[in-house]
């Protein structure tokens, strides 16, 4: 994989320094990119490989006070979202991508169309509107041993809801 990071350097040319127990930000940047590639391809096994199964905590937009806890629940929520918005995509290359220590962050565009029912975590089913969304999307992730243990997914939820016709 080769993508622009920090000016003219590419991922494949950045130095990767770190012990087996503490992966370097470069490695985590590569993993972040691969994770979003897995999301776009609906490759759920690869998606799972980058999230700590037992204790990952994921804060979805609009649900900051009720995060998803555990890899299986995060996968289930992600699969439900992708079923409702089957053409959704995280744009690559990212507009901004950086890492520091155990953290990575990116900013990009997130798009999709609401074409199938969406089941919410509480069991409520929202019927599709056929409307599309395009929002600025960012993720801040904390990594441990090559897996995300804490993830903040951010986009303007009010704009998202308005664009898909739910507000």
Predicted regions and their residues:
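C-terminal and inter-domain tail/linker signature
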Residues: 2-167
